[in-house]
Every structure is written in C-alpha cells, then in structure tokens.
Amino acid sequence: SLSEQTLTHTESREEFFQRRENEQKTLTPKPAPLPLPPTASPVPQGENMIEFCDVTVTYGSRHILHHLDWTVRCGERWALTGPNGAGKSTLLSLICADNPQGYACPIHLFGKRRGRGESIWEIKKHIGFVSPEMFSTYRKPLPAIDIAASGLRDTIGLYVRPSQQERELCLEWMERFGAGDLATRDYLSLSDGEQRLVLLVRAFVKQPALLILDEPFHGLDDELTNRARSIIDAYMARPDRTLIMV
C-alpha cells in the first residue's frame, strides 16, 4: 500500500526542471558541425598582409602612434593588448582603411601602398571585423540574417539584397554559431548577447583572409564562447588565413 512506501528523494520545482533539462541535453545528440568553406579572397601564405613603416599618427599635439614598424604575414596570429588609450583602436582603423591619416602614412595593405588609388572596399573585402563599438552602431530594425549578410559588403544596414545563395551561406554561418533560430527575428528584439553573436557571425560570412576580432566574446555566455573559440580555431586551421585578436 502507499503507506508502506518510503520517500527516498525530494527536490524543489526549479531543481526538477533543471535536472530534466540536463537529462535532455545528455540524450539529444549535438548536430555535426558544418564544414567550413574556403577563403573567399586568399592572400598567398607568407606574403605581407600588413606593413607599417615608421608610421606616426597624431591628434593635435598628442602622438597616438609614434614611429611604428609592424609587419603581419599571411597565416600569422596576433594578439594586441594594452590599456585604453594605448592606440589599439587607431591601429585597427588604419588597417580597415577607416582612418584618413592612413593615406599619408607609409602603409601597405594586402600588397598595395595606401593612397595609390585603391578604394576602401578593395581593402575591406579581405577583412572580417567585429568590435564593441559596432554593438552601438548597428541599430537597424532588420531580420538578424540581414545584419549578418551586411558583412558581405561591409555596410551598416543592408542596401543590396543578397542572393539566395548568399542568404543560405549566412544561415549556415548562423547555424555554426548556434544562432540559426535567430535568423528571422528582428535584430533589435534580441538580447544584448544575441546581438553580439550576430555581429560576430557577420565577421565570418564572406570567409575573409584577415579576421580582426576586438573583444569577440564580450556578452556571450560560456557555452557560446566555447563554441565561438572552436569555430575560430577551425577557421584558422587554413594557412591562408590571418588573425588579429584584441
């Protein structure tokens, strides 16, 4: 009878649902990772992607960069560290062709001297970029997949409708990062962490030769951070890809 049974375990409602969730994660196999596509605009391995020769940048009387010599070769991985105001953002703006002082500096990007007639888009097509500043810049009421697709043409917002093939490519990248279910949702309705994840996806969609990731894991939980690290490591396994991490 019921009166003869012994109660062996008790748990709160929250503990019960957490246990069921953990059991479900254990029983549900993780999908196989999608294969990574080749680099879209490769640069020959070993060639200089970035070359700064005695570069100085000033704002008023303040020297932000002072006689800087720096060479980044294809296939290398760099980590830029330093306190706020050390010049990291200025350095990245020179690489991404966003700083007008770059025209007057002895800088070579992807084998070409800056200021010799190349457009900024010819430079940006090689670069996938994400930074904390982009989080405050991208305030467009668009589906998340369109925000990711804006990385194909380096725009803030989507001004050229992507082809079906491009949309499928962007969706594949969102699925790699565990963001596939966000694709059709309004970007502005997403949480801060989800928005940052979409912007990280945006950096990868054109399979760039150079990744510049400025605090890429900021706002991501542990699971998404670990997934992103794995994707970055897998992406960088190809010798024609270069990474600058800040």
Region annotations inferred by a language model:
Residues I50, I64-H67:
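Conserved structural motif at the start of ABC-family nucleotide-binding domains
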Residues S131-S189, Q195:
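ABC-family P-loop ATPase nucleotide-binding domains
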Residues L211-E215:
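Catalytic Walker B motif of ABC-type/P-loop ATPase nucleotide-binding domains
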Residues D222-L224:
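Helix N-cap at the start of a conserved alpha-helix in ABC-type nucleotide-binding domains
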